């Protein structure tokens, strides 16, 4: 339900185009949206029930601001600017940079070709990004051999090794004419833009000439260069009749999620693709979310823009082009229209796969938990809590609690308990005392703090532990929480649940669990997890108590000195390794430090 502040502001909303900025309790902008009609759009967040990501957003809105503009186009441009400025949590967040290498022709007096992952606005030429760093490296090496520029660090007064190898124009020892660089750069650009026939023809002629001149080593090098073109460049499928650099975007929406595919066309080939999926914050206008995504995509640092962006029907091309500064088109037929449909099919496939994986995962998590509740004859509940105790012949008794939410560990809910009761040896009475104490402490605190109670408690044990737990819940705390025991057979394998409610006249009975069922696997997982957690905590507690006991036995070491040692060193091993000076720095006197060294 909206706060009174928001209710009052909703009455003042204009029926105009503009942007709205949703804010949290700290005044931080958490979502930016735009609309042709601010009144209808903003009111829709608070005047109807919400689901999924939008429900989560609304829950966190404490206030909002609006900015009115003259048109929907202006609203879109402003939205792009605001998202870039505030980076709101509930808007699409894209990683900066592509993570892929580019081939750069540097903008220098003596230019060179190199690999880079950062694109600077320095008037250099950038080609890429390349999906594979090895492919990019191989292409660069080919260019440096066939179209040499500068490969050395600059003028040294003598020719470099690369000059002798024919891979440097010689700026290391002479003035290279700009026209010579321009000619080579022109060839490199043609090659990287897909025009390879001229290069093949030139290399073939040079190879034949080298053979005729009996320069067989040189002819072999040229043959290898031709082979590189045939095996790598020509093998890539040509999918366009021209060499215009294009990015193709399409999307698919299902179950309040949007899946977006980006195809990168470079050198007349499909160079690579990117997939993005995220929940829709505003389900009413997926086209707006799609356009906002593209605007953010090109707002990233180091992004090299294509000459043209292709989008599906229904997207305002002029509005998007104004936002990203790139020509935007919707193909109607031919290869590009086929690629657009391919992008949509891939977007759908990705989203369908995601939902299938989620469904499979739910069968092993939430579905498994449903099986446990169904076996007990209980309505489904999200939270299961489980206890286990650990001690060594009654020494250092502890209990541990684990929480499972919808079939998965909810680790922020885990708790540890140092038991306060005196335990002399392990028997049924001790288990009862341990259970009663930890259940009392856990749920009296939840009552006091008005926290959520679990839907089911699973005890690692049989009827003794279950009855002790139920007694405290019903008779002391007046709580009605179902309690079941995870019972082991004579081979110490858990295969049954023990459940009953004597307070409601239901006798205890063993409920078998199918060993092949997901519910059985979840039950054993809960039991293993609570046992692991209890054992680990007990080992830590026992080690610490043993250390305290050893220190207490040293003459002259009282509680204050012991605390100083524990705070400074933390373990018996480190105290043993410490020098007299180290012990004195921890706050001990010379006599105390000597006593510690002698005793340990």
Curated annotation (Swiss-Prot):
GO terms for biological process: nucleotide-excision repair; SOS response. The keyword Transmembrane does not apply. Keywords: Cytoplasm, DNA damage, DNA excision, DNA repair, Excision nuclease, SOS response. GO terms for cellular component: cytoplasm; excinuclease repair complex. Gene3D superfamilies: 5' to 3' exonuclease, C-terminal subdomain, GIY-YIG endonuclease, UVR domain, UvrC, RNAse H endonuclease domain. GO terms for molecular function: DNA binding; excinuclease ABC activity. CDD domains: GIY-YIG_UvrC_Cho. Its main location: cytoplasm. Pfam families: GIY-YIG, HHH_5, UVR, UvrC_RNaseH, UvrC_RNaseH_dom. Residues 197-232 form the UVR domain. It comes from the Bacteria. Residues 15-92 form the GIY-YIG domain. It is found in: Cytoplasm. The keyword NADP does not apply. InterPro entries: GIY-YIG_endonuc, GIY-YIG_endonuc_sf, GIY-YIG_UvrC_Cho, RuvA_2-like, UVR_dom, UVR_dom_sf, UvrABC_protein_C, UvrC. The UvrABC repair system catalyzes the recognition and processing of DNA lesions. UvrC both incises the 5' and 3' sides of the lesion. The N-terminal half is responsible for the 3' incision and the C-terminal half is responsible for the 5' incision. This is UvrABC system protein C. It comes from Lactobacillus delbrueckii subsp. bulgaricus (strain ATCC 11842 / DSM 20081 / BCRC 10696 / JCM 1002 / NBRC 13953 / NCIMB 11778 / NCTC 12712 / WDCM 00102 / Lb 14).
